[in-house]
Swiss-Prot record:
This is Transcription elongation factor GreA. PROSITE patterns: GREAB_1. Pfam families: GreA_GreB, GreA_GreB_N. Necessary for efficient RNA polymerase transcription elongation past template-encoded arresting sites. The arresting sites in DNA have the property of trapping a certain fraction of elongating RNA polymerases that pass through, resulting in locked ternary complexes. Cleavage of the nascent transcript by cleavage factors such as GreA or GreB allows the resumption of elongation from the new 3'terminus. GreA releases sequences of 2 to 3 nucleotides. Keywords: Coiled coil, DNA-binding, Transcription, Transcription regulation.
Length: 160
Protein backbone atom coordinates (compact mmCIF):
# COMPACT_ATOMS: atom_id res chain seq x y z
CA UNK A 1 0.00 0.00 0.00
CA UNK A 2 1.57 3.24 -1.18
CA UNK A 3 1.63 5.99 1.45
CA UNK A 4 0.29 9.43 0.50
CA UNK A 5 1.90 12.51 2.11
CA UNK A 6 -0.62 14.78 3.81
CA UNK A 7 -0.59 17.71 6.21
CA UNK A 8 -2.25 17.36 9.62
CA UNK A 9 -4.95 19.84 8.55
CA UNK A 10 -5.60 17.91 5.34
CA UNK A 11 -5.96 14.67 7.31
CA UNK A 12 -8.36 16.30 9.78
CA UNK A 13 -10.49 17.72 6.94
CA UNK A 14 -10.85 14.26 5.38
CA UNK A 15 -11.83 12.82 8.77
CA UNK A 16 -14.54 15.48 9.17
CA UNK A 17 -15.93 14.75 5.70
CA UNK A 18 -15.92 10.99 6.38
CA UNK A 19 -17.79 11.41 9.66
CA UNK A 20 -20.37 13.69 7.96
CA UNK A 21 -20.97 11.18 5.18
CA UNK A 22 -21.23 8.22 7.57
CA UNK A 23 -23.31 9.75 10.37
CA UNK A 24 -25.45 12.37 8.61
CA UNK A 25 -25.61 11.74 4.86
CA UNK A 26 -25.89 7.93 4.97
CA UNK A 27 -28.94 7.84 7.34
CA UNK A 28 -30.63 10.69 5.39
CA UNK A 29 -30.20 8.83 2.10
CA UNK A 30 -31.51 5.58 3.61
CA UNK A 31 -34.57 7.52 4.77
CA UNK A 32 -35.10 8.89 1.24
CA UNK A 33 -34.86 5.38 -0.23
CA UNK A 34 -37.41 4.01 2.26
CA UNK A 35 -39.79 6.89 1.56
CA UNK A 36 -39.46 6.49 -2.22
CA UNK A 37 -39.92 2.71 -1.92
CA UNK A 38 -43.22 3.29 -0.11
CA UNK A 39 -44.58 5.03 -3.22
CA UNK A 40 -45.00 1.70 -4.99
CA UNK A 41 -43.73 0.44 -8.36
CA UNK A 42 -39.92 0.80 -8.29
CA UNK A 43 -39.44 0.31 -12.04
CA UNK A 44 -40.86 3.77 -12.81
CA UNK A 45 -40.04 5.49 -9.53
CA UNK A 46 -37.62 8.32 -10.39
CA UNK A 47 -37.36 9.42 -6.76
CA UNK A 48 -36.24 5.92 -5.75
CA UNK A 49 -33.65 5.70 -8.54
CA UNK A 50 -32.29 9.17 -7.69
CA UNK A 51 -31.93 8.20 -4.02
CA UNK A 52 -30.17 4.93 -4.96
CA UNK A 53 -27.79 6.88 -7.21
CA UNK A 54 -27.07 9.32 -4.37
CA UNK A 55 -26.43 6.36 -2.07
CA UNK A 56 -23.99 4.84 -4.56
CA UNK A 57 -22.13 8.15 -4.89
CA UNK A 58 -21.97 8.61 -1.11
CA UNK A 59 -20.75 5.05 -0.46
CA UNK A 60 -18.11 5.43 -3.16
CA UNK A 61 -16.84 8.64 -1.58
CA UNK A 62 -16.80 6.98 1.87
CA UNK A 63 -14.65 4.15 0.48
CA UNK A 64 -12.34 6.69 -1.20
CA UNK A 65 -11.95 8.69 2.03
CA UNK A 66 -11.28 5.56 4.09
CA UNK A 67 -8.59 4.52 1.59
CA UNK A 68 -6.93 7.96 1.62
CA UNK A 69 -6.95 8.08 5.42
CA UNK A 70 -5.54 4.54 5.68
CA UNK A 71 -2.69 5.41 3.29
CA UNK A 72 -1.97 8.86 4.76
CA UNK A 73 1.55 9.69 5.84
CA UNK A 74 0.79 12.71 8.04
CA UNK A 75 3.67 15.18 8.06
CA UNK A 76 3.78 17.90 10.72
CA UNK A 77 5.02 20.78 8.61
CA UNK A 78 5.19 23.11 11.63
CA UNK A 79 8.35 21.18 12.56
CA UNK A 80 9.95 21.73 9.16
CA UNK A 81 12.21 24.66 8.36
CA UNK A 82 14.93 25.77 6.03
CA UNK A 83 15.07 27.46 2.69
CA UNK A 84 14.92 24.37 0.47
CA UNK A 85 11.48 23.72 -1.01
CA UNK A 86 9.88 20.37 -0.19
CA UNK A 87 6.49 18.99 0.82
CA UNK A 88 4.58 21.49 2.98
CA UNK A 89 6.47 24.60 1.89
CA UNK A 90 4.53 27.76 1.10
CA UNK A 91 6.29 29.39 -1.84
CA UNK A 92 5.94 32.90 -3.23
CA UNK A 93 6.68 33.12 -6.94
CA UNK A 94 6.93 36.04 -9.34
CA UNK A 95 6.16 35.46 -13.02
CA UNK A 96 9.28 36.67 -14.83
CA UNK A 97 7.23 37.94 -17.80
CA UNK A 98 4.31 39.69 -16.08
CA UNK A 99 5.80 40.36 -12.62
CA UNK A 100 2.58 38.88 -11.19
CA UNK A 101 3.00 37.35 -7.73
CA UNK A 102 1.49 34.00 -6.70
CA UNK A 103 1.62 32.05 -3.43
CA UNK A 104 1.35 28.25 -3.47
CA UNK A 105 1.61 25.63 -0.77
CA UNK A 106 2.79 22.15 -1.76
CA UNK A 107 0.46 19.57 -0.20
CA UNK A 108 -0.68 15.99 -0.70
CA UNK A 109 -2.90 15.11 -3.64
CA UNK A 110 -6.10 14.63 -1.56
CA UNK A 111 -5.89 18.16 -0.13
CA UNK A 112 -4.84 20.07 -3.26
CA UNK A 113 -7.14 22.98 -4.15
CA UNK A 114 -5.87 25.62 -6.57
CA UNK A 115 -8.59 28.07 -5.48
CA UNK A 116 -7.14 27.96 -1.96
CA UNK A 117 -3.52 28.20 -3.13
CA UNK A 118 -2.67 24.53 -2.50
CA UNK A 119 -1.01 22.45 -5.22
CA UNK A 120 -0.37 18.72 -5.25
CA UNK A 121 3.17 17.52 -4.74
CA UNK A 122 2.69 15.59 -8.01
CA UNK A 123 1.78 18.69 -10.06
CA UNK A 124 4.23 19.96 -12.70
CA UNK A 125 4.76 23.22 -10.77
CA UNK A 126 5.48 21.46 -7.47
CA UNK A 127 7.84 19.01 -9.17
CA UNK A 128 9.73 21.97 -10.68
CA UNK A 129 9.96 23.69 -7.27
CA UNK A 130 11.08 20.72 -5.12
CA UNK A 131 14.72 21.11 -4.08
CA UNK A 132 14.99 24.75 -5.17
CA UNK A 133 15.70 27.73 -2.88
CA UNK A 134 14.74 31.39 -2.59
CA UNK A 135 16.24 33.39 -5.47
CA UNK A 136 16.20 30.49 -7.93
CA UNK A 137 14.32 30.56 -11.21
CA UNK A 138 12.18 27.67 -12.42
CA UNK A 139 10.60 26.96 -15.78
CA UNK A 140 7.30 25.09 -15.94
CA UNK A 141 5.46 23.79 -18.97
CA UNK A 142 1.94 25.24 -18.85
CA UNK A 143 -0.94 24.76 -21.32
CA UNK A 144 0.00 28.07 -22.94
CA UNK A 145 3.70 27.21 -23.17
CA UNK A 146 6.70 27.50 -20.86
CA UNK A 147 6.41 29.88 -17.89
CA UNK A 148 9.40 31.16 -15.91
CA UNK A 149 9.12 32.09 -12.23
CA UNK A 150 11.48 33.49 -9.63
CA UNK A 151 11.18 32.09 -6.11
CA UNK A 152 11.01 35.09 -3.75
CA UNK A 153 9.98 33.46 -0.45
CA UNK A 154 9.85 30.02 1.23
CA UNK A 155 7.74 29.63 4.40
CA UNK A 156 6.52 26.81 6.63
CA UNK A 157 2.93 26.94 7.92
CA UNK A 158 -0.14 24.71 8.08
CA UNK A 159 -2.61 25.21 5.23
CA UNK A 160 -5.61 27.30 6.14
Amino acid sequence: MEKVPMTANGYAALQVELKQRQTVDRPRIIEHIAEARSHGDLSENAEYHAAKEEQSHNEGRIADLEDKLARADVIDITKLSGDTIMFGATVTLVDEDTEKKAVWQIVGEPEADAKKGRISITSPLARALIGKKKGASVEVMAPGGAKAYEITKVEWREPS
